[in-house]
């Protein structure tokens, strides 16, 4: 079983929301997108895999087809068990960010972002011009204009994004066009 914990993995840092990922430690593998909440470049992520699945990971991602890399089973090197091989060191920005903020710093960021999402969700539910497309559970709020054509929703996304203070993305959820606000800001 694989768990895609792109956003959800960070719920572990929030005592109030850690229950949302209960049982993830039983998964065979887990991915977490560092760029979602660690304030690092877009392509930074982690993939955690159980040790007993290392042969499968090696077979899937081994870069040993080049003779000069040798046999990954005989001479284990993390270089040979990831898809990137010789590309840039994406872990360094994540390490610096983790070192700078620490667990308590990220707990504050995650908790604040979740609270902000719940505040927005609450405000939107009370306004008859808006409708939530899904219950707010973490840091993402999916909503739409009540009885609005997709063109109006797209125009609202553009108008809000043109302000330059935040970025909302258009989305479609359960066949309905809407907006998506994902709170991940460290400020």
Segments the model singles out, each with a brief description of its role:
Residues 98, 142-149, 165-187:
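Conserved PLP-binding active-site segment of the aspartate aminotransferase-like
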Residues 6-8, 35, 52, 173:
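An acidic- and aromatic-residue-enriched active-site/binding cleft used to recognize and process polar
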Residues 13, 22-128:
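Active-site C-terminal subdomain of aminotransferase-like
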Residues 119, 123-127, 155-166:
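Generic non-transmembrane alpha-helical segments
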